[in-house]
C-alpha cells in the first residue's frame, strides 16, 4: 500500500487502487486486508460478525471469494438473507473499506471441486473435515487437547468424506465505502454498482 500516491486522487484512480489492494490481499498473507470482518444477519440474534480470510478477487466481475464450513451458522444466515458486508481496515494507512453486496453459497459444482482439489492436501483442509460442526459444544478435555491431537482424530474419522463440508462464498460487490482517517483531514468516497462498473462520489466523512 502507498498512501502518498493518493495525495489527491480522482475517483477513478481511487477505485482502481482499492481493487488493486484487494487483489493483492488475496495473494499476500501479510496484507492487512487479507483477514476482513464478514457481517451477516441472523433472524434470531441480529447482526453477526466474524473474521474471515480473503481467498480470491476477480476485479472484472467485482467478486470476492471466501471459504467456510457448510455447517457454519453464517451459511444458514446467508441462505436466508444473502445481504452481507466485508469490513477491511489498514492501521498503517488509516483506511477503512466496507464492501457490501450479496453472497452466493456454493457447496457443489466446479467452483467448489476445483478449489477443494488445491486445498485437500494442505493443512487447511482439516478445517472442513471435522466431524463436529463449528460452534458445537465440546467437553473441557477436548478444548484442552493439543490441536495436533484433535486434527489426527478428526482426519481418521472423516477420511471417507471427500470434500466433506467445504463451501465457497462468492460476494458480488454492490457498494464500496472508503474512509481515510488522516490528521490533515479525513476523506470518504462511496462507489455504487452500475451495469458498467462502480460509479463513485465524494462524501462527508
Q: Where do the model's predicted regions map?
A:
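Binding-site signature for planar aromatic cofactors or substrates
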Residues: 1-205
Amino acid at each position: 500500500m502507498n498512501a502518498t500516491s493518493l495525495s489527491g486522487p480522482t475517483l477513478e484512480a481511487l477505485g482502481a487502487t482499492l481493487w488493486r489492494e484487494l487483489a493483492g490481499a488475496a495473494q499476500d498473507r501479510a496484507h492487512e486486508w487479507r483477514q476482513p470482518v464478514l457481517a451477516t444477519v441472523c433472524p434470531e440474534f441480529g447482526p453477526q460478525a466474524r473474521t474471515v480470510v480473503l481467498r480470491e478477487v476477480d476485479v472484472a466481475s467485482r467478486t470476492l471469494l471466501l471459504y467456510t464450513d457448510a455447517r457454519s451458522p453464517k451459511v444458514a444466515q446467508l441462505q436466508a438473507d444473502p445481504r452481507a458486508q466485508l469490513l477491511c481496515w489498514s492501521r498503517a494507512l488509516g483506511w477503512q473499506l466496507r464492501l457490501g453486496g450479496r453472497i452466493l453459497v456454493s457447496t457443489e459444482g466446479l467452483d467448489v471441486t476445483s478449489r477443494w482439489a488445491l486445498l485437500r492436501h494442505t493443512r487447511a483442509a482439516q478445517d472442513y473435515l471435522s466431524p463436529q460442526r463449528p460452534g458445537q459444544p465440546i467437553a473441557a478435555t477436548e478444548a484442552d487437547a493439543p490441536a495436533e491431537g484433535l486434527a489426527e482424530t478428526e482426519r481418521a474419522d472423516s477420511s471417507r468424506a471427500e470434500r466433506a463440508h467445504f463451501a465457497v462464498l462468492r460476494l458480488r460487490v454492490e457498494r464500496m465505502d472508503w474512509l481515510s482517517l488522516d490528521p490533515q483531514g479525513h476523506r470518504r468516497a462511496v462507489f455504487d454498482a452500475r451495469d458498467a462498473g462502480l460509479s463513485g462520489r465524494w462524501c462527508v466523512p
